[in-house]
Amino acid sequence: MLLKVRRASLKPPATPHQGAFRAGNVIGQLIYLLTWSLFTAWLRPPTLLQGPRTSPQGSPPRSPWGDCAEPSCLCEMKIRRRRHEGPAWGQSGFLAGGLHLVPSSLSLAACGVVRMKGLWGRGAGIRGR
């Protein structure tokens, strides 16, 4: 009587959260956060980037928007607050929560509506002609 000895494979068993789907989510997240931070930094007036300055009277300078806080800072604070709410902050909940704050071109790329496979997949050169 022969018993087959099954050797343990070198690769661990694939779990559903590993693989291309998860990696795509992370890359999409990073692109989204990078573009959003660049976008908000571009909106900021230069005085805020240089640091808080006080006027000769001692009161802080007024922002061009009046008494209210700066919109892009508020948006970033909202996004950061949402990001720490749940364990799956990088998944659809985070993106759906922050999408109404961003321009449509950024949100389309963040949602993955622009599919990379269709643009740069195998055979795209032949199909594109």
From Swiss-Prot:
| UniProt protein name | Transmembrane protein 105
Example GO CC term: the record gives: membrane
The protein's UniProt keywords, in alphabetical order, are: Membrane, Transmembrane, Transmembrane helix
The topology of this chain with respect to the membrane is:
Multi-pass membrane protein
Which taxonomic lineage is given here? Eukaryota, Metazoa, Chordata, Craniata, Vertebrata
Quick one: where is this thing mainly located?
Answer: membrane
- Keyword check for Lyase, yes or no: no
Q: Which pairs of Cys residues are joined through disulfide bonds in the record?
A: none
Which compartments does it reside in?
Answer: Membrane
- Does the UniProt entry include the keyword S-adenosyl-L-methionine? no
* Transmembrane segment boundaries: 23-43, 94-114
